[in-house]
């Protein structure tokens, strides 16, 4: 049986670490009482083997085995480079 890996898209908010990036994943959640859709942001640490990401890039990341205390995601591809 093949294992399906969870993937997410997000924006790189930090690339200061070696071979690591911090990705902010935004999602829309409906407020339970008022019904308004509100943005919620989750920040995850991801593994970037070749240090190819820059600040502001849009990336796709996939879940993987724990690589460190906080890293359980790995970079799949860079979808869009930031316009600087």
Curated annotation (Swiss-Prot):
Entry GO MF terms: rRNA binding; structural constituent of ribosome
Keywords tagged on the record: Ribonucleoprotein, Ribosomal protein, RNA-binding, rRNA-binding
InterPro entries (UniProt xref): NA-bd_OB-fold (IPR012340), Ribosomal_uS17 (IPR000266), Ribosomal_uS17_bact/chlr (IPR019984), Ribosomal_uS17_CS (IPR019979)
PANTHER family with a match to the protein in the record: 40S RIBOSOMAL PROTEIN S11 FAMILY MEMBER, SMALL RIBOSOMAL SUBUNIT PROTEIN US17M
Subunit structure: Part of the 30S ribosomal subunit.
Similarity comment text for this entry: Belongs to the universal ribosomal protein uS17 family.
Name used for this protein in its record: Small ribosomal subunit protein uS17
């Amino acid at each position: 049986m093949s294992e399906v890996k969870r993937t997410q898209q997000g924006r790189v908010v930090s690339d200061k670490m070696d071979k690591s990036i911090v990705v902010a994943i935004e999602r829309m959640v409906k407020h339970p009482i008022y019904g308004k859709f509100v943005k919620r942001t989750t920040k995850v640490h991801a593994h970037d083997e070749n240090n190819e990401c820059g600040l502001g890039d849009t990336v796709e990341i996939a879940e993987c085995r724990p690589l460190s205390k906080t890293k359980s995601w790995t970079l799949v591809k860079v979808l869009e480079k930031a316009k600087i």
